[in-house]
Each structure stands twice: as structure tokens, then as C-alpha cells.
Amino acid sequence: MKISVVTPFYEGDRYMQDYVSCMEKNREMLAQAGHELEVILVNDSPWKTLKAPANGGQYFRVLTNSENRGIHYSRVSGLTEATGEYVMFLDQDDLLAEDGLLRLMQAALKNPSDIIIGNANLGQADGSNLVWYRTADHVKLIWDLQTYLNVGIQIISPGQCLIKKDAIPQFWKEHFVRVNGADDYYLWLLMMAAGKTHSFCGGSPVYNHRFTGDNISADTTATDDSVYDFLELLSECDYFKQEDIFRLHEMITYKAQFRKSNLFGKLTCTIANLDIFIANLKFKKVTKTGYGFNR
């Protein structure tokens, strides 16, 4: 079996050395088990030349956008060229465990599904790491549509996921999010709405989300803007329910209001969205995570 790792690069030279080292270690582990790795780098800063690393061997390929097109477009560009049965979208500044891809592949072969999700280390500003899924109850909610509509996205990054290439919805490949930050949220919603199946790769984290200070995913304003962008697109999707679009809009708007309001404002908007507030309190309790309310 072959895995294609697709990574958009935007002025990411400083990450290249660690990235290549990570891919080489994973390639070696896969090769020992009889699997292949293909790495596709998509240069989204075409004013700078991005070359395949000299020590990257023949499994590295570089595509260059004609202009800056954003993360979603770049991921789809790489996906179009991918030749693996499975694909991973890994960010330029994140890394995998040395056996991360192998363990995900083994999980895929043991329990075939459309997406295999592994645990993640979430880097903190103080240099520590937080393991993302810490309870069995949280694992049960990884692929639960209602949780995504009432609480928020439960996958830190597509870099912790192995996706069957032919399971990625055509709608996602044709309707692009223009604002960077939440095209993965958009992908998971479309896959769940289409009835795509998932499985969980247990054990230690396969993925390390590094805190760089530049992470878009840590900026709730940017990700909210991206969600509002894809909500407009979802209205054109014939299998995504309008009531679910409305619910997601309610949740994102409520949380944005809550974060920027004083105490009185928080109380006022919470009373107006009491069901969402209660859903988030329940989520925080069963998952034992402080990230429940603020996504």
C-alpha cells in the first residue's frame, strides 16, 4: 500500500530540515513493512523557489502554484497528483512520530474505514505537550456530527489522519474555502454528512502539533472567518442539511460573542443559547479538557 503525504509550503524554509527528517524516518518504517511513501510539497509562495530536498530521494515531488492560492486549494492540488491509496494532509510546521504513518496504516488494514484518526500531542506556549484525547468518552465523540455542530472540531489537524483518497468528497475538491483556517473542519463535516466511516488508532500520539506562534488554528478569529466562508459553500451541497448549517452558524457566533463580551454580555448571550452552553459543559466534563468551550 502507498501513502501520499501532501503539504502546502508557504515561505516555510525554516521547517524543511525537520520535515524531511520526519518523512525519511517514516518512509523507512513503512518500507520495512512493505509499504510505500510519496511526499508532495505544494509551493504556495511561488515568488520563492522550492526544491525537493537533495536527501529526499525519488519519493519527494514539488508542485508550484501559479500564484498564492491558500491552503485548501494547495491541498487539493497535491491530492490531484497523489498516487497513494491513502492520503495525509500534513502542515509544514508539524511533525509525526517516527512510526506514525506505519501505525495508522496498520490500523487501516486491521479495521478498514474511510478515515483513520490517531491521537495528537498539542504543543503549548510554555513548551509542554498536551495529549488531546484523554478519555474514552472523548474518543467516542471524534466522529460525531452533533459534537461538531454544538461544540466544535475534534480533530486537531488532518496531520493526525489517514484518509482513503477515494473517500474525499468531490464537493470539497471543487468548492474552495477562500479564508485559511478551517478547510479541514469543512472536510470532516462533508465526510460525516456523506456517511463516511472512521476508526481510531490507539496508543501513543502519532502527530505533534508544534506551537510556533504563527499557527492559524490557534487564532479563533481567523478560524471563525474561515467557518463563515465555508458555511456559504455548504448551502450549495445537496446532502448537507440546512438546519445543520444554521446550528453551526449559531454555535460559532455565540462563542465569538462570549469570548469578546464582559460578564453581562456573556450572561446575555448564554441565556439566548442555553442549549449550546449546556452541550459544551457536558463535553468539558466527559472529555476532561479545558478546550471544550473555546474549541
Regions found by a protein language model. Name each.
Residues 27, 57-59, 101-171, 221, ...:
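Flexible acidic/His/Gly-enriched loops in nucleotide-sugar-dependent glycosyltransferase catalytic domains
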Residues 87:
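Short aromatic/hydrophobic "clamp" motif used to bind/position activated sugar donors
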